[in-house]
Regions:
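N-terminal secretory signal peptides
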Residues: 1-14, 21-24
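Conserved C-terminal helix/tail region of periplasmic/extracytoplasmic solute-binding proteins
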Residues: 346-413
Length: 413
């Protein structure tokens, strides 16, 4: 279902005025509280089996920081946190109007923007997630070329499938699995996919699921989305783990890898326009959690997600250390993060997931309404990082000007 996204000039001016008032409301919290609080219930969808969003939201839940910051803005907030196994059921709830905040990756976000769904991108939810092409420990599949004629599990319509197409594109020259007689089986449940069940020769797994299956079942990795080999690899680049594959340097996403993974927090247009101060409170709570967790031992951070990851601290720490949120220590979207959506849309055309790539204007529009709300949270939490941090040339992730400075973003096609 396509929903028309009508943004008329007058409506935009009214919203900007409202957003500005919301920022002032946060600063003038004692006065607002004295006048009584507005009761509001919001729903927040999270993916606790994934990466950084899991410990971050757990921290927010345990410390009720979303509720507290909303209280500072004059709200008596009740938060309904919901656990989702993947993006698909979240997207369904969101499109049907039954979810206020959700978090999912590049691939479903691009599809929604392409369909003109009225999504508002708020912040980076997690990123630089490691996906592993995995198989059984006794499998003769040792490299990407060995997938020809085989059956591979991947979450259709999600990031794992897109990762697979990019591995095929740069290793074999074509992103379409059908070009190599590869049958792709949908794997909505990562725990099951990680067992490499009968009828499946290999699967693309998220890192927590791979680590658990590797430790308990002996599931082995072939290559990962960062462009490095895993322990079961044997091929033109050599044998064993830790070899940078030459083909990854051809990727538009390098040095991030074959795929520039970013998951974003999404807000419904209704909540963004009717209660912008609540959106700023959400962002403030997220940044508070990210800043605090980034300073903690990664193994202890992973303990917040142990119920879902089921990993010992030394293994959970690997997931935490990969995540761009904890590398940065902040959650603000930048030009580099927006580019991830633009470039992903191009690869999705190659993979026949959408018919044409997004226009740069479409990507920017998806961030536009929430940009002033992010800026309010940035100011409230101490303005970290400074301008130099956004443009750090030595950073190992793609950055750039923050979303509230998108007027300085370059022209792209």
């Amino acid at each position: 279902m396509n929903i028309e996204n009508d943004r008329k000039g007058a409506s935009r001016r009214r919203f900007i005025a409202t957003a500005g008032a919301a920022s002032l409301a946060l600063a003038a919290a004692p006065l607002v509280r004295g006048q009584g609080r507005k009761a509001l219930k919001v729903s927040v969808g999270r993916q606790p089996w994934a990466a950084g969003n899991s410990p971050v939201t757990r921290y927010m839940m345990d410390n009720k920081t979303f509720e507290r910051y909303a209280g500072d803005a004059g709200y008596d907030l009740t938060v309904d946190y919901r656990d989702y196994p993947s993006a698909a059921p979240q997207v369904e709830a969101f499109v049907s109007g039954n979810l206020d905040f959700g978090m999912w990756g590049n691939t479903p976000i691009v599809r929604l923007i392409a369909q003109n769904q009225p999504i508002q991108i708020i912040t980076v939810g997690e990123g630089h997630f490691r996906f592993v092409l995995a198989t059984r420990k006794d499998s003769p599949i040792r490299n990407v070329a060995d997938l020809k004629g085989k059956t591979v599990g991947a979450l259709l319509g999600g990031d794992p499938y897109n990762v697979l197409t990019q591995m095929l594109r740069y290793e074999l020259g074509n992103p379409d699995p059908k070009a190599f007689n590869i049958t792709v089986v949908n794997t909505p449940t990562q725990a099951q996919a990680a067992t490499i069940p009968g009828g499946m020769d290999a699967a693309v797994l998220i890192y927590p699921a791979f680590l658990k299956a590797n430790a308990e079942l002996g599931t082995v990795g072939i290559i990962n989305s960062f462009g490095y080999t895993e322990s079961h690899y044997k091929g033109p680049a050599g044998e064993g783990a830790g070899i940078l594959l030459p083909s990854v340097k051809k990727s538009a996403f390098y040095p991030d890898g074959y795929y520039l993974h970013r998951s974003f927090w999404i807000g419904s247009r209704k909540i963004v326009e009717s209660d912008p101060a609540v959106v700023t409170a959400f962002v403030t709570a997220q940044q508070d959690a990210v800043a605090k967790l980034s300073k903690m031992d990664p193994g202890k951070v992973s303990e917040l997600a142990k119920k879902y990851w089921e990993l010992a601290p030394e293994l959970g720490a690997k997931v935490v250390e990969d995540d761009v949120l904890f590398k940065r220590g902040w959650c603000w979207p930048t030009e580099g993060d927006a580019v991830a959506l633009l470039e992903t849309s191009k690869s999705m055309v190659d993979g026949k997931l959408i018919t044409k790539p997004l226009a740069w204007a479409q990507v920017k529009t998806a961030f536009a309404l929430t940009a002033p709300l992010d800026k309010a949270a940035y100011d409230k939490t101490g303005g970290v990082p400074d301008a130099a941090g956004f443009h750090d040339k030595n950073a190992k992730d793609l950055r750039g000007a923050p979303v509230w400075e998108m007027q300085s973003w370059g022209e792209r096609s």
